[in-house]
Structures are given as structure tokens and as C-alpha cells.
């Protein structure tokens, strides 16, 4: 079913951001005291297992665990309702699920571990649900789940401080644009929903950011990928919809993470290259340059016009 599989893909998309974010959080946290775990329906992992309990990620998981039993009860009581109606309001609370299933974070395994656990939790969360697979319900669910995914990414970025403050602010504006576009699309006829979403989203994001978002690497990437992923919902075969949706989101979120990790090293390499160019462009120039005319070395040194 389309909505179920889209939900799994979005779990993966969030994990692709959370994984690199965890690498910047550090591995030196001491285990937290297990007092709060008494409220969980399932006991936390044994004390001997290093869970990096001081990280923001762990606390997100702990909060999610407190809501899991309540959410499961609601789903049981409302079997005739669409699962997207039941789950979407609680997406932010249950995105990572139980604390005892959080993988150990390390600089070498966090990224792949989070992809694995995202698939596991995403698949497990859809088992046994009653689902209305109507296209209109699917469209509405996708919009709101994407909006919630943006919210989770924003929260992780603010807490772990991987994403610069300016880009976190832009993410908040993108989230607001999603909300505006989703509302407009929900009210449009079924055949016009995608067109209305794209036009409303473009208008809202330009109004809220003033075009400044184009200066950031991953905002335009995310914008384009979500449109491409949603456009795939017009395909007739569910497996084709899902493959395109998953691929587009995976590439976009991976590109966002990589651009963020490589931004500073790339800037340093660029500066070093400029310095080398400046020192080698003019062969054996006299130490005190007396000429008033700019030399080729000065031009190579990176003067901005």
C-alpha cells in the first residue's frame, strides 16, 4: 500500500539526517541514570550496553517510548479508521520508537545502523493496521508526514548543532511553506492536488524566505526532491511509486548531509589552493613589490571584483 511504503521511506529519510548528525554529537557521554525508564512499557536495554544516553537522539527515543503504548491502544480502538489519520499526529513522538532498540552510535557505524533501524521500525509500525488506500487519503497523509519529517530534522539540527543557525531558520520557513501548501492541496479537487501543492509551495517558500534559501545547499535539493517524489504518486504500479519516492528522498537527504559535513573542509581546501596559487604564480618576484600596478600574483590571490 502506497501510504505504508511512503511512511517507511520517510523513516529512512529522517535516519539519513539523524545518522550524520549523531557523528557530530560525540561518543564521550556518560550513561544516564535509568530512573525514568520505569514508565516504559518495555524495559530499557541492559546497563552494560553503551547507549550514549546523554545524546539528544537518545532523549528523543526515550520520549517516543512513553507514547508508544498509548498510540498502540488508540490504533486498536480505532481499527476502522485510516492508519494515516491515527499516526500522523503522533509522528514526531514515535519516529524513533522504543529506547531499547536504539543502535549503539559510533563514528563508524551510526549511519548504517540508523538506516537499518529506520527500515525495521518503519516496517514494524504498519503491521496489522486497517488502511484506507484511497488516493485522496494517500495524498493528505504524504503531505503531513513530510511536514512532520521536516519538524524532526529541525529539532535534531537545533539540539546537536550540526546545521548552522541560519539554515535551521530556513528549515523552519520551509516547514511553514509545507503546511501552507498541504492545506491548499487538501482543499483542491483530487486531479489538481499536485499542481496546487507545487504552486502553493513555491509561492509560500518565496514569501517566507525572500529567496534567501537559494544560498543554502540543501534547501533547493530538498524542495526539488519532494516534488519529484510526490510526482511519482501518479504512477499506476505501487512498487514504481515507492522506488522513485524512496530514491529521490534518499539522494536528497544524503546530499544534504554530505554537503553539510564537507562545507568546512572544502572551504579550507579552497583557501589553501588560493594561497598556493598566489605564492607560485609570479616566479622570483622581488621581496618588496614597489610597482603600483597589480601583478598576476595579486590577481591569483583571490581579490574579489
Swiss-Prot record:
SUPFAM superfamilies: Group V grass pollen allergen. It comes from the Eukaryota. Residues 65-85 have a biased composition (Basic and acidic residues). Belongs to the Poa p IX/Phl p VI allergen family. Residues 1-25 form the signal peptide. The keyword Transmembrane helix does not apply. This is Major pollen allergen Pha a 5.2. Keywords: Allergen, Signal. Residues 65-87, 279-299 are annotated as: Disordered. InterPro entries: Pollen_allergen/Os. Transmembrane segments: none annotated.
